[in-house]
Amino acid sequence: MPTSVDDLLRRAVENKSSDLHLKVGNHPYLRVDGLLTPLTDVPRVTPEEMLSMAFSMMTNRQKQKFKETAELDMAYGVAGLGRFRVNVFQQRGNVGMVLRVIPTKIRTSEELNLPPVINKICEEQRGLVLVTGTTGSGKSTTLAAIIDRVNATRADHIITIEDPIEFLHRDKKSFINQREVEVDTANFSTALRAALRQDPDAILVGEMRDLETISTALLAAETGHLVLSTLHTLDATETIQRIIAVFPPPEQKQIRLQLAATLKAVVSQRLVRRADDKGRVPAVEIMIATAYIRDCIINPDKTRLIHDAIAAGTSQYGMQTFDQSLFDLYSKQLITIDEALARASNADEFKLRIQGIRSASDAAREEMERQMADFERFARR
C-alpha cells in the first residue's frame, strides 16, 4: 500500500491525473479529466501521516513559514517521476494538501489544440501579453508553450519570475533565467524591478497579484520589453476592468492610456471535456489589441464593446470568442453537442448557428465589422 507522498504521486502520474488531494480522515483523491475520484484502496490519511508527508517535502525555512502562516506554496520534484506544484494549508486544525502534476514535456501550441494565432502572438517583440482563466484552466501550460516557442525561435534573454517554478526551460536559441519567489527573490514586484536592470528581452511574471506588480509590468512593457503574465479572470473584458480597478480612481484614466498603448493580446481559456473522453481540450477566447479595441480600453463607455469587437475580428485578426471556439471544437468533433451547449455563453444562439440559421448576433457582428473597418481606416490617416 502507498505510504509516502512519492508513492501517491506515482499513482497520480500513472492515472494521468492533474491533481492529488489529501485530507485527514479521507482517502486520497485524484482529479482525472476534471473529475475527483477517491483511491479507496489506500487507507484514510491520519493526522500524523499528513504532517509527515507535508514536512518531508519542505526545507527548514518552508517549515518555519508554514508554522507561521498555516499555508505554503512550493515546488517538489521526484527523480524519474516529475515535478509538482504543492499547496499546503490548514483546515479544521489539520494539515491539508493539493499537489498539481506538472508535465515533464512542454507541449507546443499545436499539441495543446490552441488557435494558430497563438504563434503570431509569440512573434511580439514588446508589449503585454496576458493568459487568463480560473484555477486549473491550463494557464501555466499555455504560457510554457509560448515561452518555449520564443526560446526556440529567437535569441532573447528571457527572465521568468514564478511562485513556484513549474516548467523547467532549457536554453535553445534564447538564454533563460528562472527565479522563484521566496527562494531566489523576495516577491514578484521586487524581482520585476530587478529584471529591468538585467538586460531582458522577455519577462514572464507568474501572476500579476497587486498594484505594484501590475504597475511595474506596464512600465516594463512600455519601455520595450515583452511581458507575459496571468490573471484569474474569465475573459478579456473582465481582465481589462480588473487591471484598471486595482488603481485608485484618480489614476485610472492614465492607466487606461498606458494599458491601451502596451497590451498586445489577451488569451482566456477554459478546459472542456473531449468527445472521446480522453482528457480535456481548451476553449479559448483570443483578443488582439487592434486600434478599435485600444479605443475601447481608453474610453470607459466603450469597454463593454470589446466582446463584440472580438466576435467581429475573426477573419481579419484571428480573434475569437468562447462560443466561436466551442463551435470550432464541435465542428472538428473534438467535443459533443451537449458539452458545447453546457459551456456556451448563449446556448440558444449556439443551436441556431449549428442549424445554419442567422441570429441577432450575426447581424450585430456584421455591423461591428463595418464599424471596426471604418475606425481602422480613420486611425491610419
Question: Whereabouts are the PLM-identified features?
Answer:
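Short, flexible helix-loop junctions that flank or precede catalytic/ligand sites
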Residues: M1-R381
